[in-house]
Amino acid sequence: MISNLEIKNYKSINQMELNCSRINVFIGEPNSGKSNILEALDLSFLSWMMHINEVNKKVNTELIDLKSFFRVNKVADMFHLGNFNSPISITHPGFSAGTNIEYIQDKEKDINLFEFNNSNGSFTNFDSDFIPQDPLQFYATPIKPYRYKSNIQFHDTGNYIQRLMAPFGNNLAKVIYHNTDMQQLAKEFAKEHGFDLNIDNANDNITLQLRINEGIVYSLSYEALADTYKRILFYSAAVKHTNARVITLDEPDTHAFPPYVSYLAEEITKQKEVQFFIATHNPYLLNSLIENSPADQLSVFVVSYDRLNRTTVTKKLSDNDLSELLDFGVDIFFNLNRYSNDSIEYPS
């Protein structure tokens, strides 16, 4: 487990140190830098995502748009205030090799490159568009990001089978097919709406079917399914069926019906062997995690942007703060200033 995390020179973060728990939740106003904290951890998976793309090119399957994933137009946008003089550095002593990204000049080829390297001495060079350069070297990591996409191309390139493929879960159909708990979850949701679940294992496809009469079946493709349904399947698989030791989830509660948000929170608390880093704006998710997590296994950080020092900062809530949220029903999302700088704000 990551006990201590240090991030330097990444996007809005100049320098940040966090004392982490098994479940780490980041809350704060939009554009405060919550997602940047998750992305900093995701950088350790960057080399492997490049590997996934190289494999997918050969079999003509969906590529990961790395610019979109990291929300940049070019690699240079990842450096804090465009500072190339210092590398991007993510360290977590005692857990796994740290990650560095630094700017380098290839004088022989007269091109500017970036080098992904870790404390084990491994490296991958790539250009400003995230295109890896020879020699191609890629490295796996125990940290995996999971990000929901409404429309994905199902495939199991890499033969993950029972474990959900990061970052988008392209093998979700296989995961449901090979795990009875996922089958049950999918079937129950379909049954509530009068449909039957159909998994086409040969073609990696998910549909819901409604029997009209003998020999007549109406089918709904995965793309046409309700967003809440697709999200709960994806995030349930990510939480329960991963080989990662650490996973990051960015607003897994978006567009989700409150009972499903509470269900997801309960599943997160049950996975004792996995560490979570989660950004959220959802009081249902936050309160469910506080209610169901032992105090020593949960950390909640209020994230804000320090305009004076031009950096994202965090404040970890105390046990008393968390008790107050539950005991008095305080909606922290209307009182963020109270917990970050002791002032109180109310909704208008």
Predicted regions and their residues:
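Phosphate-coordinating catalytic segments in nucleotide- and nucleic-acid-processing enzymes
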Residues: 46-246, 306-348
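Switch/communication elements of ASCE P-loop NTPase nucleotide-binding domains
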Residues: 1-50, 216-348
